[in-house]
Amino acid sequence: MTRFLVSEENPSGRKLEDILMELRADVLTRCTKISGDTRPEALQVMANNMKVLEHLTAAIALSQESTHLLDRAFGPSEAAKGGPPRIGVA
């Protein structure tokens, strides 16, 4: 069973790209709160956050690509309605 993602057992779950976009927004919010802090520690945290944002953006793009691929090949997901997975096993 998945904890966060939509699945047969978790029809109220969310799509991976939606979770990642929300997480990216949270990181951006944190960045704005430390953007004026010029202490070395804050600058390093900001630099780290920028790298994290790059990785999150890449992960979002990959997840969206997978969703589009599955939509084209098998039609829209029915997992939110308790339907079977489009690929793999339940």
List the predicted regions and their residue ranges.
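Short intrinsically disordered terminal tails
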Residues: 1-4, 76-90
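Residue-level marker of intrinsically disordered, low-complexity segments enriched
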Residues: 3-4, 17, 32, 50, ...
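N-terminal acidic leader/helix
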Residues: 1-34
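Short, charge-rich amphipathic interface segments used for partner binding and complex assembly
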Residues: 32-79
